[in-house]
Amino acid sequence: TEPLWRFWQSCGFELVRIGSKPEASSGCYTAMAILPLSEQGEALRHAAHKHLARDWPWLRQRIELALAIPGDDGDTSLGEEDWRELAGFAFAHRPLEASLGALQRLLLASNLPLPALRGHLQRRQSPAACAEQAGVSGQKALLRHWRHETAQALEQLNAQHCRYWRDWAQSLQ
């Protein structure tokens, strides 16, 4: 909740992650906040907050909280952190919700149609509508389809880089 976040913020914590769906038991969004106690902690806080700020334009469309997350520099190009997240989504088991910002930046970078991904993320179609449009049945089949479209876009953008990150993701399984 916003009052709970204000409390932690007044204690010096900085928000670095927030879930995209409220928890069923509490109705609150999951969140992670950091209070750095060392130079390394400050570096971690800075990097994590920058990542959240970069993803916030897309996350706030799904989160019903009026939070100000400053620090987005407007850069929508794909960086190495995005490639790692996208490889985790396309070639491993990273959830779509945990990859929203990177997926949105991928859609901006790719000129492929990617109808299921664009339908859900850019046109805000329901998963059921995306599955019907893609000709697949069920949430698991749709997720496989989204992963496939993501892999296609990565391959199209940079085949060598895609192979590197695919191999990296598969080495972790």
Where are the predicted features?
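Terminal substrate-recognition subdomain of acyl/acetyltransferases
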Residues: T1-Q173
